[in-house]
């Protein structure tokens, strides 16, 4: 099962349960590269944004999602691979270089690329200082940056809560 079938099967349930909405989708190009730079409040953010955009969106995701143990670890890793998530090593310095290069490659091939400039979820719903990855992606790929705001998802799924309420 690939990105499209997962979106087609999981998407309607998410739309029915959570009724996410988007405003300004006309700013997302129908074709060609663009960087969707969003604040990050909850795990569910990475489901809602692709659900509301007509094109496939590849995201960076922490490398921990690809190294879990047991059945849950296997399921998470395979889901992340299937939806095109690029693992990023967040230990600092040049550790994230490979993930950013993979993002540049996707952008140069005309795809949408989602990234959370803060580098992690906000623990309290506030916006924190972003890292330089978005600027580097834009400068090296020539892709436009489209700002995205997630609103209220931290209330639906606080950090540590497994399933959004």
Residue spans for each PLM region:
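Short, basic, glycine/proline-bearing loop/turn elements
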Residues: 9-11, 82-90, 117-121
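Catalytic core of membrane glycerolipid acyltransferases/transacylases, capturing the structured
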Residues: 30-93
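Residue-level preference for the first positions of well-ordered beta-strands
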Residues: 33-35, 112-116
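A cross-family acyltransferase "interaction/gating" segment
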Residues: 28, 112, 123-165
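Short gly/ser/thr-rich secondary-structure transition/capping motifs
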Residues: 15-23, 95-97, 151-154
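A transmembrane-helix-recognition feature enriched in membrane-embedded lipid enzymes
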Residues: 1-23, 55, 71-83
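Hydrophobic/aromatic ligand-binding patch that stacks against planar heteroaromatic rings
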Residues: 48-49, 79, 105, 136-140
């Amino acid at each position: 099962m690939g990105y499209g079938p997962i979106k087609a099967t999981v998407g309607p349930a998410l739309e029915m349960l959570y009724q996410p909405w988007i405003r300004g989708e006309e700013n997302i190009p129908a074709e060609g590269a663009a960087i969707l730079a969003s604040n990050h409040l909850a795990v569910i953010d990475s489901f809602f944004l692709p659900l509301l955009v007509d094109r496939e969106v590849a995201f960076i995701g922490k490398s921990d999602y690809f190294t879990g143990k047991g059945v849950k670890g296997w399921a998470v890793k395979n889901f992340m691979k299937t939806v095109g998530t690029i693992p990023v090593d967040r230990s600092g310095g040049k550790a994230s270089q490979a993930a950013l290069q993979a993002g540049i490659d996707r952008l140069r091939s005309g795809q949408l690329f989602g990234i959370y400039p803060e580098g992690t979820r906000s623990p309290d719903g506030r916006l924190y200082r972003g890292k330089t990855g978005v600027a580097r992606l834009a400068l090296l790929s020539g892709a436009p940056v489209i700002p995205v705001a997630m609103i209220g998802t931290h209330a639906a799924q606080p950090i540590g809560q497994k399933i959004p309420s």
